[in-house]
Amino acid sequence: MKKNEFAVVLASDNRGILPLSVTVFSLLNTAGPETFYKIYVLSDGIDGENGASVERLAAPFDCRLEFIDVSGILEEHDFPHTEQWPVPAWGRVFIPELLKEERGNILYLDIDVLVCRDLTELFRTNMDGKAVGVVFENFSRPGSHFNERLEMPLTCTGYFNSGVLLMNVDVFRERNLVRAVLDYA
């Protein structure tokens, strides 16, 4: 029986190995019998021991796990990388270019996400020509204290969670959206 193959991208460095491991395990442990995840980890210097620990965690599952070094990807761009936004986090911008062999929907997950069930239904979401599917944050409601923290006007309703992104990489490529994001940044 042919399994449904889905690409999932996460991003981490050595400091994030524990939450990365939890997210990977929760993803694989909830996968249905017909689901095969291709997991790509955008890495900024994950050392051999830490990478091997994630590989051992994934080994009992029917999946593919690949680390992609993105440590040099921002050298030509003037992106600010901070503790909150390290190099691997910026890597999500480059997913359509980094994973040229992938087509259709790819799921990006932050490493603080706990997966509670098989994601086949999510991957089969009809994106209807849209480049990205997002979940709007409830905190962006007018009057929320997060509006002040985010320095957004009280009428702002457009803040979304960038830690869960369903990306249609075909649309990104057709519309050259990576270049558009780079030009905007």
Model segments located where?
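Glycosyltransferase catalytic domains, chiefly GT-A lineage
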Residues: 1-185
